A protein has these predicted regions:
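Beta-rich carbohydrate-recognition and catalytic domains
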Residues: 1-146, 150-205, 210-251, 263-264, ...
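Glycine-rich, charged/polar anion/phosphate-binding loops
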Residues: 254
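Anionic-ligand-binding alpha/beta catalytic cores of soluble enzymes and soluble regulatory domains
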Residues: 258
Length: 274
Protein backbone atom coordinates (compact mmCIF):
# COMPACT_ATOMS: atom_id res chain seq x y z
CA UNK A 1 0.00 0.00 0.00
CA UNK A 2 1.17 3.53 -0.72
CA UNK A 3 2.85 5.88 1.69
CA UNK A 4 1.31 9.04 3.08
CA UNK A 5 3.88 11.82 3.33
CA UNK A 6 2.35 13.75 6.20
CA UNK A 7 2.73 13.98 9.95
CA UNK A 8 -0.96 13.68 10.78
CA UNK A 9 -2.02 10.26 9.53
CA UNK A 10 -5.72 9.77 8.78
CA UNK A 11 -7.22 6.79 6.91
CA UNK A 12 -9.74 7.23 4.14
CA UNK A 13 -13.40 7.09 5.20
CA UNK A 14 -12.64 6.62 8.90
CA UNK A 15 -11.20 8.29 11.98
CA UNK A 16 -8.25 7.50 14.24
CA UNK A 17 -8.87 6.67 17.89
CA UNK A 18 -6.36 5.59 20.53
CA UNK A 19 -2.96 4.50 19.24
CA UNK A 20 -1.01 1.45 20.35
CA UNK A 21 2.58 1.99 19.14
CA UNK A 22 5.19 -0.76 19.03
CA UNK A 23 8.79 -0.59 17.77
CA UNK A 24 10.97 -3.31 16.26
CA UNK A 25 13.91 -3.43 13.85
CA UNK A 26 13.69 0.12 12.56
CA UNK A 27 9.92 0.22 12.17
CA UNK A 28 7.23 1.80 14.30
CA UNK A 29 3.99 -0.17 14.18
CA UNK A 30 1.25 2.37 14.87
CA UNK A 31 -1.81 0.25 15.62
CA UNK A 32 -4.86 2.41 16.13
CA UNK A 33 -8.59 2.22 16.79
CA UNK A 34 -10.25 2.47 13.39
CA UNK A 35 -13.60 4.22 13.82
CA UNK A 36 -15.70 3.96 10.62
CA UNK A 37 -18.56 6.08 12.05
CA UNK A 38 -21.05 4.06 10.07
CA UNK A 39 -24.04 5.60 11.86
CA UNK A 40 -24.37 9.41 11.97
CA UNK A 41 -23.82 10.69 15.49
CA UNK A 42 -22.47 7.35 16.75
CA UNK A 43 -18.82 6.97 17.70
CA UNK A 44 -16.59 3.92 18.20
CA UNK A 45 -19.09 1.41 16.79
CA UNK A 46 -17.68 -1.61 14.92
CA UNK A 47 -14.22 -0.44 15.93
CA UNK A 48 -11.23 -2.64 15.09
CA UNK A 49 -7.45 -2.36 15.19
CA UNK A 50 -5.86 -1.12 11.99
CA UNK A 51 -2.18 -0.55 11.34
CA UNK A 52 0.08 2.09 9.83
CA UNK A 53 3.85 1.61 9.79
CA UNK A 54 6.63 4.18 9.61
CA UNK A 55 10.40 4.36 9.83
CA UNK A 56 10.64 8.11 10.45
CA UNK A 57 7.27 9.13 11.99
CA UNK A 58 6.66 11.25 8.90
CA UNK A 59 5.85 8.85 6.08
CA UNK A 60 3.20 6.31 7.04
CA UNK A 61 2.27 3.16 5.14
CA UNK A 62 -1.32 2.05 5.75
CA UNK A 63 -1.42 -1.73 6.25
CA UNK A 64 -5.17 -2.25 6.65
CA UNK A 65 -7.04 -4.10 9.37
CA UNK A 66 -4.83 -5.84 11.92
CA UNK A 67 -7.33 -7.40 14.34
CA UNK A 68 -10.90 -8.12 13.28
CA UNK A 69 -13.81 -7.71 15.64
CA UNK A 70 -16.08 -10.54 16.72
CA UNK A 71 -19.73 -11.08 15.88
CA UNK A 72 -22.62 -9.11 17.34
CA UNK A 73 -23.05 -11.69 20.11
CA UNK A 74 -19.37 -11.80 21.09
CA UNK A 75 -17.59 -9.82 23.84
CA UNK A 76 -15.31 -8.30 21.19
CA UNK A 77 -18.09 -6.85 19.05
CA UNK A 78 -15.95 -3.73 19.40
CA UNK A 79 -12.19 -3.79 19.91
CA UNK A 80 -10.60 -1.01 21.89
CA UNK A 81 -7.21 -0.05 23.33
CA UNK A 82 -4.51 -2.44 24.51
CA UNK A 83 -0.84 -3.23 23.99
CA UNK A 84 1.57 -5.50 22.11
CA UNK A 85 4.28 -7.65 23.68
CA UNK A 86 6.84 -10.06 22.23
CA UNK A 87 7.50 -13.47 23.73
CA UNK A 88 10.13 -15.72 22.22
CA UNK A 89 11.61 -15.39 18.75
CA UNK A 90 8.58 -14.63 16.58
CA UNK A 91 5.70 -14.80 19.02
CA UNK A 92 3.68 -11.64 19.58
CA UNK A 93 0.57 -11.05 21.66
CA UNK A 94 -1.88 -8.17 21.58
CA UNK A 95 -4.05 -7.69 24.65
CA UNK A 96 -7.06 -5.50 23.94
CA UNK A 97 -10.32 -4.22 25.40
CA UNK A 98 -13.38 -6.16 24.31
CA UNK A 99 -16.74 -4.40 24.55
CA UNK A 100 -20.29 -5.35 23.69
CA UNK A 101 -22.97 -3.04 25.09
CA UNK A 102 -25.44 -5.95 25.16
CA UNK A 103 -23.35 -7.99 27.63
CA UNK A 104 -24.34 -6.70 31.06
CA UNK A 105 -23.97 -7.31 34.78
CA UNK A 106 -26.47 -5.70 37.14
CA UNK A 107 -27.88 -3.79 34.20
CA UNK A 108 -24.55 -2.21 33.18
CA UNK A 109 -22.40 -3.02 30.16
CA UNK A 110 -19.08 -4.62 31.10
CA UNK A 111 -15.61 -4.48 29.62
CA UNK A 112 -13.18 -7.38 29.38
CA UNK A 113 -9.72 -8.21 28.06
CA UNK A 114 -9.10 -10.50 25.10
CA UNK A 115 -5.91 -11.59 23.37
CA UNK A 116 -4.69 -12.02 19.80
CA UNK A 117 -1.47 -13.57 18.51
CA UNK A 118 0.79 -12.98 15.51
CA UNK A 119 4.09 -14.14 14.05
CA UNK A 120 4.79 -11.07 11.91
CA UNK A 121 3.05 -8.08 13.59
CA UNK A 122 0.83 -7.73 10.51
CA UNK A 123 -1.58 -10.67 10.62
CA UNK A 124 -3.36 -11.35 13.92
CA UNK A 125 -5.80 -13.95 15.15
CA UNK A 126 -7.89 -13.64 18.31
CA UNK A 127 -7.83 -16.45 20.85
CA UNK A 128 -11.56 -16.94 21.36
CA UNK A 129 -10.97 -18.94 24.55
CA UNK A 130 -9.14 -16.12 26.32
CA UNK A 131 -11.35 -13.75 28.31
CA UNK A 132 -10.13 -11.88 31.38
CA UNK A 133 -12.63 -9.93 33.47
CA UNK A 134 -12.41 -7.85 36.64
CA UNK A 135 -12.62 -9.72 39.92
CA UNK A 136 -15.62 -7.61 41.05
CA UNK A 137 -14.05 -7.61 44.49
CA UNK A 138 -11.22 -5.08 44.41
CA UNK A 139 -12.30 -3.65 41.05
CA UNK A 140 -15.61 -2.77 39.41
CA UNK A 141 -16.67 -4.88 36.42
CA UNK A 142 -17.72 -1.94 34.30
CA UNK A 143 -14.37 -0.17 33.88
CA UNK A 144 -11.75 -2.75 32.91
CA UNK A 145 -9.91 -1.61 29.84
CA UNK A 146 -6.76 -0.50 28.05
CA UNK A 147 -4.48 -3.37 29.18
CA UNK A 148 -0.77 -2.55 29.09
CA UNK A 149 1.35 -5.70 29.41
CA UNK A 150 5.10 -5.74 30.03
CA UNK A 151 7.77 -8.04 31.43
CA UNK A 152 8.93 -7.22 34.95
CA UNK A 153 12.50 -8.41 34.70
CA UNK A 154 13.15 -8.14 38.44
CA UNK A 155 10.20 -10.35 39.39
CA UNK A 156 10.51 -12.60 36.35
CA UNK A 157 6.82 -12.37 35.48
CA UNK A 158 4.42 -10.31 33.41
CA UNK A 159 2.47 -7.32 34.66
CA UNK A 160 -0.74 -5.94 33.25
CA UNK A 161 -1.87 -2.39 34.03
CA UNK A 162 -5.48 -1.46 33.33
CA UNK A 163 -7.78 1.53 33.46
CA UNK A 164 -10.06 0.52 36.31
CA UNK A 165 -12.09 1.70 39.27
CA UNK A 166 -11.79 0.61 42.88
CA UNK A 167 -14.85 -1.15 44.20
CA UNK A 168 -16.64 1.33 46.45
CA UNK A 169 -14.21 4.09 45.50
CA UNK A 170 -16.89 6.66 44.75
CA UNK A 171 -18.16 8.10 41.49
CA UNK A 172 -15.61 10.88 41.06
CA UNK A 173 -12.36 9.68 42.67
CA UNK A 174 -12.44 5.90 42.33
CA UNK A 175 -10.30 5.76 39.19
CA UNK A 176 -7.08 3.77 39.51
CA UNK A 177 -4.45 1.85 37.60
CA UNK A 178 -5.17 -1.80 38.31
CA UNK A 179 -2.37 -4.37 38.51
CA UNK A 180 -2.55 -8.02 37.45
CA UNK A 181 0.27 -10.56 37.25
CA UNK A 182 1.01 -13.68 35.22
CA UNK A 183 3.88 -16.09 34.54
CA UNK A 184 2.61 -17.34 31.19
CA UNK A 185 0.47 -14.54 29.64
CA UNK A 186 -2.54 -16.86 30.02
CA UNK A 187 -3.43 -17.08 33.70
CA UNK A 188 -3.73 -13.74 35.47
CA UNK A 189 -4.33 -12.77 39.10
CA UNK A 190 -5.65 -9.43 40.32
CA UNK A 191 -3.43 -7.53 42.74
CA UNK A 192 -3.85 -4.35 44.76
CA UNK A 193 -3.93 -1.19 42.57
CA UNK A 194 -0.64 -0.13 41.03
CA UNK A 195 -1.57 3.54 41.46
CA UNK A 196 -4.70 4.94 43.11
CA UNK A 197 -4.39 8.69 43.79
CA UNK A 198 -8.12 9.23 44.49
CA UNK A 199 -8.14 12.16 42.06
CA UNK A 200 -9.99 11.01 38.93
CA UNK A 201 -13.12 9.30 37.63
CA UNK A 202 -10.87 6.93 35.73
CA UNK A 203 -7.32 6.84 34.37
CA UNK A 204 -7.31 5.65 30.76
CA UNK A 205 -4.58 4.14 28.59
CA UNK A 206 -1.98 3.44 31.30
CA UNK A 207 1.62 2.82 30.30
CA UNK A 208 4.86 2.54 32.23
CA UNK A 209 8.45 2.68 30.97
CA UNK A 210 11.94 3.39 32.20
CA UNK A 211 14.00 6.26 30.81
CA UNK A 212 17.35 6.96 32.40
CA UNK A 213 17.14 6.41 36.15
CA UNK A 214 13.42 7.13 36.33
CA UNK A 215 10.26 5.14 35.77
CA UNK A 216 7.40 7.02 34.12
CA UNK A 217 3.70 6.23 34.48
CA UNK A 218 1.50 7.73 31.77
CA UNK A 219 -2.31 7.87 31.80
CA UNK A 220 -5.14 10.01 30.41
CA UNK A 221 -8.11 11.55 32.20
CA UNK A 222 -11.28 13.46 31.45
CA UNK A 223 -12.36 14.49 34.98
CA UNK A 224 -11.55 18.19 34.63
CA UNK A 225 -10.29 18.27 31.06
CA UNK A 226 -9.15 15.83 28.41
CA UNK A 227 -5.42 15.44 28.90
CA UNK A 228 -2.56 12.96 29.35
CA UNK A 229 -0.63 13.02 32.64
CA UNK A 230 2.62 11.46 33.80
CA UNK A 231 4.17 10.51 37.12
CA UNK A 232 7.80 9.71 38.05
CA UNK A 233 9.38 7.21 40.44
CA UNK A 234 12.75 5.60 41.05
CA UNK A 235 11.19 2.13 41.27
CA UNK A 236 7.98 0.47 40.15
CA UNK A 237 6.94 0.35 43.79
CA UNK A 238 6.88 4.16 43.92
CA UNK A 239 6.34 6.57 45.50
CA UNK A 240 5.07 8.28 42.35
CA UNK A 241 5.93 11.96 42.21
CA UNK A 242 3.66 14.51 40.53
CA UNK A 243 5.75 16.99 38.49
CA UNK A 244 4.80 20.65 38.61
CA UNK A 245 3.75 20.46 34.96
CA UNK A 246 2.46 16.90 34.70
CA UNK A 247 0.70 16.94 31.32
CA UNK A 248 1.62 16.22 27.72
CA UNK A 249 0.77 18.82 25.10
CA UNK A 250 -2.82 20.23 25.09
CA UNK A 251 -6.32 18.81 25.40
CA UNK A 252 -6.43 18.36 21.61
CA UNK A 253 -3.85 15.55 21.85
CA UNK A 254 -5.33 12.71 23.91
CA UNK A 255 -4.61 9.14 25.00
CA UNK A 256 -0.88 9.47 24.44
CA UNK A 257 1.17 6.27 24.43
CA UNK A 258 4.84 5.94 23.56
CA UNK A 259 7.37 3.77 21.76
CA UNK A 260 11.17 3.84 21.82
CA UNK A 261 13.92 2.71 19.46
CA UNK A 262 16.30 2.45 22.40
CA UNK A 263 17.66 5.95 21.89
CA UNK A 264 14.61 8.17 21.47
CA UNK A 265 11.03 7.84 22.68
CA UNK A 266 8.12 9.15 20.61
CA UNK A 267 4.62 9.98 21.85
CA UNK A 268 1.62 8.93 19.76
CA UNK A 269 -1.85 10.37 20.36
CA UNK A 270 -5.04 11.27 18.54
CA UNK A 271 -6.23 14.78 17.74
CA UNK A 272 -9.90 15.68 18.11
CA UNK A 273 -11.87 16.05 14.88
CA UNK A 274 -13.53 19.23 16.13
Amino acid sequence: MGQMDKLFFKPDHAWVGDLIPYYENGTYYAYYLHDPRITPGEFAEQTTWHLATTEDCRKFRYQGEAIARGGDDRPNKNIYTGSVIKKGENEYYAFYTAYNADIRIHGKSVQSVMRASSQDLIHWETDEDFLFVADDCMYESFDWRDPFVFKNEEEGNYWMLLAARKKGGGAHRGGCTALCKSRDLVNWTCEEPFYAPEMYVTMECPEVFRMGSWWYLVFSTFSDRFTTHYRMAKTLDGPWEIPKDDVFDTRADYAIKTASDGQRRFAFGWIASK
